[in-house]
Amino acid sequence: MTDPQRKLSAAELTEAGLTGWHLTGEALTATFKTRKFSTGLELVNRIGASAEEANHHPDLTLTYREVGVTLTSHDVSGITIRDIDLARTISGHAADLGVAAEE
């Protein structure tokens, strides 16, 4: 799983063990229940900074009580290690804020 351009198999995605992340078509999705808009905004800001650093940008939805995240690698029309790495980073940001992804 080291080639950042290689589309991952379903088995590799399962092996990654991303709690709260789901395979939706050719993307990984997660919904983080932030309970407050200010917490959601902080999570979005942290995700944005990490996405810029990684040069890999998720689709985000911010609502009053949750943040939705969709990750995919458009260049390969699927999920790569870049998505797995960013999902782990995002989950870490959420945990730091006391927020969990919906199962």
Predicted regions located by residue number:
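Charge-rich alpha-helical segments
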Residues: M1-E103
